[in-house]
Structures are given as C-alpha cells and as structure tokens.
Amino acid sequence: MLKKTIAIIILIIGLLLIFSPFIKNGIVKYMSGHETIEQYKASDIKKNNEKDATFDFESVQLPSMTSVIKGAANYDKDAVVGSIAVPSVDVNLLVFKGTNTANLLAGATTMRSDQVMGKGNYPLAGHHMRDESMLFGPIMKVKKGDKIYLTDLENLYEYTVTETKTIDETEVSVIDNTKDARITLITCDKPTETTKRFVAVGELEKTEKLTKELENKYFPSK
C-alpha cells in the first residue's frame, strides 16, 4: 500500500514538472489577455494615476510557477493607467502604474512615479517569457519606423521607433526624464537569467483625442 502511494505521489510530481510550464504560460496569458482597456473609463484611469505606486525593481525575478500563482491573486486592477499597442509585432497590453512582480505578469509597467503620457520620457517595462509571443517578448522584433500607440482613454499618443539597442542592466539612465517626448520600452534580452536589457525608443509623432473608432482600431477587445 505504501509503495503504491509513493508511486502515485512520484507520478503526480512528474506530471506537474512536465506540465508546469504550460500551466504557467496559460495563467500569464489569461492575466494579460482577459481584460482590455475598453473595460475601463477615462475617469478610472485618471483616478488610478493619482494613486501611489511601488517601484520594486530589485524584487522582480524570472516568472516561476510560485510567482505566477501569487501574481494571479495579487495584481492590482486599480493600478491600470492605460494601454499600449505595437501593431507590427502584435502587442496589445494594459499599462499598470508601478513595477512589481504581480503587475509585470499582467501587462506593461511604468518605471517612474512622475511619468506622464505624451510628455518627456515615458518608460515601460515588460517580461520576456519563454513563449515569446507573450507580454514584451515580441518587442525584440521591433524595428525602426514601427509605430507604438499609447492611450489614457482621453488621448491617443502615436510614437515612431527611432532606435533599438541592447544595454547592461546597470544603465538605468534610459528611464530618466527628457525634454523631448518619447517612449522607452525595456525588456530582458532573453527569457532566461541575463544582465542585458533590450530597449526600443520611440519619438512622439502625434497626439489626438481618442475616439471610439481609434480605440477599436488600436485597442480591440480580445
């Protein structure tokens, strides 16, 4: 009886080890895809932007099964401050105020407490998963000239990618504010442990009022 119980336990552990990457990816895909910006109002976004946020860069780790399960329970829907779309690489994510493990599993995260869409430098961080179609994995394929769209449900901000580069993780000056209006997208250069970061920088080309037509075009429901 004891041997049979042990065999069952070993089998269960083995199955969990085999299927845990698929389970983990499934949870992250659900977290980052089941909600869209259309579920929010401009007044919600404005209220969320006024709240304090944490920027706990040092605590951020590679997504593990444990962190994904915790993140699924703890990510803050009241931290949503907008949405980002990069049509050329099929990125469409919510933007969360504050960088922490839970928010990074649900979308892109802001990196400074004072950043404002359409003004100065607007840096965003995102995870690079083993399934490179998820979160900021596709950003690795961004090229000069590609368009990046941001919205706070009041305006649509259109940026054009002007530069892509790989930097060391210590080069934190890329998130500093600037006089020119730009967006800076940052992710790890590979889905495993690394000290390098891939960066895509875009210049603000146009700001216009967000209409329902524009929202449906760039931020469609999933």
From Swiss-Prot:
Q: What happens when the gene is disrupted?
A: Mutant is defective in processing and surface anchoring of internalins and several other LPXTG-containing proteins. Mutant is significantly less invasive in vitro and is attenuated in virulence in a mouse model of infection. Deletion of the gene does not affect expression of the genes encoding LPXTG surface proteins. A double srtA-srtB deletion mutant has no cell wall-anchored proteins, and is as impaired in virulence as a single srtA mutant.
**Which keywords fit this entry according to its UniProt record?**
Cell membrane, Hydrolase, Membrane, Protease, Thiol protease, Transmembrane, Transmembrane helix
- Per UniProt, what is the membrane topology? Single-pass type II membrane protein
Q: Where is this site: Transition state stabilizer?
A: 197
Record-annotated active site = 127 (proton donor/acceptor), 188 (acyl-thioester intermediate)
Q: Known EC number(s)?
A: 3.4.22.-
Sorted alphabetically, which Pfam families does this protein's record hold? Answer: Sortase (PF04203)
Which InterPro entries does the protein's record reference?
A: Sortase (IPR005754), Sortase_A (IPR042007), Sortase_dom-sf (IPR023365)
Q: Which residues lie on this side of the membrane: Extracellular?
A: 29-222
Transmembrane stretches, start-end? 8-28
Protein activity control: Activity is enhanced by Zn(2+) and strongly enhanced by Ca(2+). Inhibited by chalcone, a precursor of several flavonoids, which blocks the SrtA active site.
**Which BP terms from GO are recorded?**
proteolysis
Give residue ranges on the Cytoplasmic side: 1-7
Q: What effect on the protein does mutating residue 197 to A have, as reported in its record? A: Strong decrease in transpeptidase activity. Does not bind chalcone
Q: What does this protein do?
A: Transpeptidase that anchors surface proteins to the cell wall. Recognizes and modifies its substrate by proteolytic cleavage of a C-terminal sorting signal. Following cleavage, a covalent intermediate is formed via a thioester bond between the sortase and its substrate, which is then transferred and covalently attached to the cell wall. This sortase recognizes a Leu-Pro-x-Thr-Gly (LPXTG) motif, which is cleaved by the sortase between the threonine and glycine residues. Involved in pathogenesis. May regulate the rate of synthesis and/or the stability of a subset of LPXTG proteins.
Q: What is this protein called?
A: Sortase A
Task: Identify the species of origin.
Answer: Listeria monocytogenes serovar 1/2a (strain ATCC BAA-679 / EGD-e)
